Every structure is written in C-alpha cells, then in structure tokens.
Amino acid sequence: MKHFEANFDGLVGPTHNYAGLSFGNVASLSNAALVSNPKAAAKQGLQKAKALADMGIVQGMLAPQERPDLYTLRRIGFSGSDANVLKQAAKEAPILLNACCSASSMWTANAATVSPSADTRDGKLHFTPANLVDKLHRSIEPLTTGRILTATFSDPHYFHHHSHLPEHNSFGDEGAANHTRLCKEYGHAGVELFVYGQEATNPNAPKPQKYPARQTLEASMAVARLHQLEDDNCVFIQQNPDVIDQGVFHNDVIAVGNQNVLFYHEQAFLNTQQKIDEIKRKLDTELYFIEVPTAKVTIQDAVKSYLFNTQIITLASGEMAIIAPTDCQENPAVFAYLNELLTLNTPIKQVLYFDVKQSMQNGGGPACLRLRVAMNEKEITAVNQHTLLNDALFNRLNTWIEKHYRDRLTTQDLADPQLIIESRTALDELSQIMKLGSVYQFQK
C-alpha cells in the first residue's frame, strides 16, 4: 500500500489583522498596528498550497474559525445586540476585542498534534487539538478546531479524535509546531520528537527568563500517552531556553524534520548530542542531522528570515525540497547558507521560494500554515474529499476569497458590525463548499 505525507493548510480568515497579540513572537510585536490585507493573505496561502498540490503532494485545506468571536465576548460580560457587543468591547476592552478577532487559526501547525497509524497501538491516526493556553487569542480555538478536524477526518474506523488537554499552564500545548516525526518511509513506524520549553512540575529545571515557554514536558507526555505511542516511538527534547528568550517561541522556528532528515540550528536544543544518540538508537535507518552553525546563520537571522519555519517535502523523485519564504532570499547570510546546503551530501536538492509576507508579518512562515498528516491510501480515501485541494476546489476558494474578503483592515475596523455579517456569510458558504456541516456556533 502507498503512503504519503499530506499537508493540511489553514485558510486565512476574513479578519486577518496585525494587533501584535503574541508576546514572545518578534514579528508579531514589531508589526503591530500595520494595515493588513486579508484578501492578499488568503490568496498567498492558497497559492502556496496549490503549488505543492501541483508538485504531487497530497494537499488539503482546513477552514478558518468564526471571528469576531462574540460568544467569548458575551461570556466575559458584554451584552445586547451583536453590534452593541462590538461597540462596548471596542470602548471598554479593545485588547480583548482584538483577541476575539484574531485570524490566528490560519497557523494549523498549532491546530493539533497528529500521530500516524504506523506509530499507534490501535493502528489509527490520532489527533489531539492543542489547548494553546499561553495566549488568550489562541486559547479560544480548541473546541472549534476539534469540530473542524472531525469534519475533515470523519471516519472513526481510521481516525481517533481526542479532546484538548486540561486548560492549565501545566499542560500548555502548542501542537505540531513543537512536534516532528522521523522515519524511513512515511508508512513505516517512526520516532516522534516532542520538543518542550519547560517542566511545569519541576521548579529547578531550566526554563526561559524573558519569554514564556509555551509547551511543557507534561503536555508532550500526555499527548504521547493519548496517542498510544510506545517509548521506542518517542523522544522528548528540551528546547534551549536561551533561544526562546531570543524570539524562538515554537520549535518550528529553529528546527524542521522530514523522513530521515533533521534540519536544526546548533543552539536549538539542550543536550543535543545525547538526544541525537537516542534517536539513532530508536530509529534504525540512515539519518541526516543537518546542524546549522551560528557562525553561518545567527539566531537573529534565523528568526527574521524563518529559515527553519520552512517545509521539507519529499518529491516523487525521492529527492527533498525546502519550501521557504522569500524572506530567506532577502537575507544574505540565510540565502548563502541555503545555496551551500544544496551542494552538501543530503537528500535536500531544491529550495523553492514563496511570498507569504502577510503571514510572515504576523510571525508565521510556510511551516506554520500547515498541519502534516502521514497517511496511507485507505486513510486518504476516508478523508472528507471536499477538503482536498485540486483545480476545482482551488478555483472555488479563489472566487470565494475574491467575493467575501476585504483588501484592507485596521484594528479600528474590528468594531465594524458589518464585519460580523461578512464573516458569517463567508464561513456559511465555505462550510457548504467543503461539506463540513455545522462546525460554527452561529450555524447551531
């Protein structure tokens, strides 16, 4: 049976804006209050996804969440008509309104952690939505994320969906952005790397001092248990607290893996050699550990360009390609390193550059925009076929974006009651296009 790694990219929602909500995310904070272009953002993401589909990669799309989130605003005491709720919130708590209007669900690397059936005891694909408790604007996502994932991967014979972890900092979980999987072939049992920022229950363990560690060891271990993984399928690695304090808020900002390749910065982890030795013991195949030295690429350049927030994909030829943001081309040190990388003895033979600037300015590169799901042929057949990107769906989504999205949005515009109507109209139509059923609260 054939096996593939599919990418499920998040459609950028109609309220994409720059509110600078993510403390610890340098790009998000430095671009706060810029005027955004939701239409361009959605099209950039869709075009990147379509380019991968055209390369033969199995490519799906995940629907955005309903924003503004009036349900959360009502839970915290704003009342009256929808328009009045927005007006009140804008006047009394503009930062809370901004949080309830964020389009951050576009970064589906944070949607969930996924373990393929080749790794799990029950032979099913497992999904656990991330609770994202560290950031208010993201902590309101998990329930809807779970509904969208269940509507996309709906057959219980193949797919096992878990609830998100308890909503407490001890179980802070940021999903696949802190998880990667190494294997010989996608259909073979692999080793899942769970990267965490701190041990919540051990006050003496290393942790960052300036910015929060969003992922705990306790959360990573809980997900591994839920997914029925054996010890031989797991390696738990602590991210270097010093790089978290330099703006590396998720591991996918400093490392990325694919099949038998782990591409990472030399400062990415604690106890790096010990963990590499553990991976080698647990995965009996030829492995390529590509360590990028600080002398060639500084942490600052890695964060600014998102060198590691790239996708590594395996092409039909068996060679690998890096999907990088154009920001990597524009950074001399990073561009020079990527050109050098292509001359080294590794499976990576191409670098392809994509413009995802609207996402980058909010702190999310190509890897943030996708959730990886390794599947076999039967599992792909069991996926909701209306979520898989082909020419017909691409054209429908492009037309949908053109019809419903604004090309200019400021944080002041978030209080416009018309935005509620526009968003709900768009999402209602999208749920019909993608045959999702009633995944949004306004549809219930």
Curated annotation (Swiss-Prot):
Note the superkingdom of the native organism: Bacteria
Role summary: Catalyzes the hydrolysis of N(2)-succinylarginine into N(2)-succinylornithine, ammonia and CO(2).
Q: Name one GO biological process term.
A: arginine catabolic process to succinate
UniProt keyword Iron-sulfur present: no
Enumerate the NCBIfam families for this protein: arg_catab_astB, PRK13281.1
Q: Lineage in the entry?
A: Bacteria, Pseudomonadati, Pseudomonadota, Gammaproteobacteria, Alteromonadales
> What keywords appear on the UniProt entry?
Arginine metabolism, Hydrolase
EC top class named in words: hydrolase
Subunit note: Homodimer.
> For substrate, which residues are the binding ones?
19-28, 110, 137-138, 214, 252, 362
Q: Which GO terms describe its molecular function?
A: N-succinylarginine dihydrolase activity
**Residues at the catalytic site:** 174, 250, 368 (nucleophile)
Q: What is its EC number?
A: 3.5.3.23
Biological or metabolic pathway of the protein: Amino-acid degradation; L-arginine degradation via AST pathway; L-glutamate and succinate from L-arginine: step 2/5
Give a yes or no for keyword Hydrolase in this entry.
yes
Query: Which reactions fall under this protein's catalytic activity?
Result: N(2)-succinyl-L-arginine + 2 H2O + 2 H(+) = N(2)-succinyl-L-ornithine + 2 NH4(+) + CO2
Q: Which family does it belong to?
A: Belongs to the succinylarginine dihydrolase family.
The set of disulfide-linked cysteines is none
Gene name of this polypeptide = astB
What is the protein name stated in its UniProt record? N-succinylarginine dihydrolase
One Pfam match, given by its short name, reads AstB
